[in-house]
Amino acid sequence: PPRPAAGSRANESVSCDLCHTISAIHSDDKFPYNFSFVSNPGRIKYGSKTGVKSPHHDTEKLDIFSQAELCANCHNEKNPFGVWVKSTQIEWLEGPYSKQGVPCQQCHMPKAWGRNATMANEDMVAQHLFNGAHDPGKVAGAIEIRMHPEEREVNYDGTIVLKVQLFNGKAG
């Protein structure tokens, strides 16, 4: 995609305010991509829960914060030639978790007891850790490897031929 205009929201990178001011997804295509969200900077911060109170801003629950399409805006990307260079959410759609109704947030932002802001009450909150391929705990067990020799007995100085199979253990 073309470079964002100087001083635009697209230059802010990932931040609390950027994500929590997304109020809608706008995409004419089958999948959201290339930052196709609508951002409304201001006093209202959006999220997945009702009843959240803050002395600094208003809050509003939006269903998109519990849907994989929210993540697709940044994790699906086409280059200027129409070629997918990132298709994370599209791959998720083709995988088992989509079919089971498990959105990205359930694994990459697991809920745990804590606070989502310093002035908030303790509650079960989405951890903003975004665990993924950079997290050894997430990667462990993602692929199951099975090896089967073609022959059960091999001479000591012989060559063994193995059939290797890889299975998706838990990758989205």
Residue ranges of predicted features:
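Primarily the internal scaffold of c-type cytochrome electron-transfer domains
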Residues: 2-172
